[in-house]
Design a protein with these regions (language model features):
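Glycine-rich phosphate-binding active-site loops on the catalytic face of alpha/beta enzymes
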Residues: 95-105, 136-150, 175-198
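Catalytic beta/alpha-barrel core
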Residues: 12-13, 31-41, 45-128, 138-140
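Charged helix-capping and loop-helix junction motifs
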Residues: 151-159
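Structural motif
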Residues: 44-46, 90, 132, 165, ...
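A short, charged/proline- and glycine-enriched loop
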Residues: 25-29
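Short acidic, glycine/proline-enriched helix-loop-strand junctions
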Residues: 113-114, 165-169
Length: 198
């Protein structure tokens, strides 16, 4: 017997049937959300960056200047990803879906070989994300946030009830700090995501 780190698991030769479980274990536990692409070079080993920006030619040029070796820790929305060149698309393996984008998709629509992270705000979206093959979901808002003060928070009890009904990793998003990770995991979160303090 020997214990392996999550990073080492990807280098081992597992049967094909085990690949889904291995992929689930390779998600980081913290997702930073920002418009600042420079954060990418300062991420912790157990962190990814969701670059939440609108699709513009300037953003595509900015991404083209980013070192290719850093792109594997980057998450971009499906709309932006579809406008990238082939090398960028092959390197950025995690694609974000807004809930509106998610609900327009059906089983078989997702590109194979990529990880999809779905933004969900209710149970029906969460279940749909799992059914069409998304590998993880952001469920929000867990707590009240400064960025969306008028959006009612789910609260931890409702978050847990929803997260328990799917088998994909669910990240808690909304009003959280890095120190909330351990509590979030006790509430059936795989990890946490956030703009300011994650």
């Amino acid at each position: 017997w020997r214990w392996y780190s999550r990073e080492e698991l990807g280098q081992l030769n597992f049967p094909k049937a085990n690949q889904f479980m291995i992929q689930k274990l390779q998600w980081p536990q913290r997702i930073k959300i920002s418009e600042d692409l420079n954060i990418l070079s300062n991420l912790d080993t157990d962190q990814m960056l969701y670059w939440r920006v609108d699709l513009t030619s300037e953003r595509i040029m900015q991404l083209a200047q980013c070192p290719v070796d850093q792109l594997s820790k980057l998450i971009v929305n499906q709309q932006l990803w579809s406008h990238l060149n082939e090398l960028q698309q092959q390197t950025i393996r995690t694609i974000h879906l807004k809930q509106t984008q998610l609900m327009e998709l059906k089983q078989g629509d997702l590109k194979s070989g990529y990880r999809y992270l779905a933004a969900c705000h209710d149970l029906s979206a969460l279940i749909h994300a799992e059914q069409i093959g998304c590998e993880a979901a952001l469920l929000s808002p867990v707590l009240a946030t400064e960025t969306h003060p008028d959006t009612p928070a789910l609260g931890w009890e409702r978050f847990k009830q929803m997260a328990e009904q799917v088998q994909i990793p669910v990240f808690a998003l909304g009003g959280l700090r890095a120190e909330d990770l351990h509590y979030a995991k006790r509430q059936h979160a795989y990890g946490i995501a956030g703009i300011r303090y994650v």
